[in-house]
């Protein structure tokens, strides 16, 4: 059962034993090494200011989509799709950070220099919601929040080298 600890979920044990599926057993066959992420935003200018101008994600373009407009940014092979709907939804992200509700609560960007990154972000006025923390041996994280209250985690994994 997951437990909250300093705003992080820690899994002590899983109630099942997983086995690797044979290739023919896999239902989802992936065609690239990452997933893309769609984020519905209330203010596309503020969201672009955060993700493109402050975090430095690469601009890919914008296009009309049914019900709104999509702004596409690259993060490695991942595409972050900011979606501004014609009608802004009333629902907001649950308060309380990653332990504040169910569902997608944050996404992670792996970085080579978490201290340098956080210093640059703080110089731009972005305050961490979780300061630089060793989550487990060899794994250091920090988190920030976008203008709509969505959490972005930065992760440095030195144990994988």
State what each model feature region is:
Residues 154:
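Short glycine-/small-residue motifs
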Residues 4-6, 17-22:
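Acidic, Ala/Val/Gly-enriched low-complexity intrinsically disordered segments
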Residues 11-12:
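Intrinsic-disorder-associated, low-complexity terminal segments enriched in Asp/Asn/His/Tyr and depleted
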Residues 47-52, 121, 149:
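Conserved active-site tyrosine of GNAT-family acetyltransferases
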Residues 40, 108-110:
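Short hydrophobic/aromatic beta-strand micro-patches
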Residues 23-35, 58-108, 118-145, 157-161:
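Vicinal oxygen chelate
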């Amino acid at each position: 059962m997951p437990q909250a600890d300093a705003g992080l979920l820690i899994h002590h044990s899983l109630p099942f034993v997983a086995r690797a599926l044979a290739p023919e057993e896999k239902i989802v066959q992936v065609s690239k090494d990452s997933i893309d992420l769609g984020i519905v935003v209330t203010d596309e200018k503020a969201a672009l200011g955060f993700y493109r101008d402050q975090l430095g994600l690469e601009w890919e373009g914008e296009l009309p989509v049914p019900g709104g407009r999509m702004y596409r940014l690259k993060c490695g092979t991942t595409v972050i799709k900011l979606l501004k709907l014609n009608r802004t939804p009333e629902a907001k992200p649950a308060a309380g950070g990653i332990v504040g509700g169910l569902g997608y609560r944050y996404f992670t960007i792996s970085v080579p220099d978490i201290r340098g990154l956080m210093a640059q972000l703080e110089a731009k006025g972005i305050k961490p919601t979780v300061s630089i923390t060793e989550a487990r041996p060899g794994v250091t994280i920090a988190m920030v929040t976008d203008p709509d209250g969505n959490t972005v985690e930065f992760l440095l994994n030195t144990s994988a080298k």
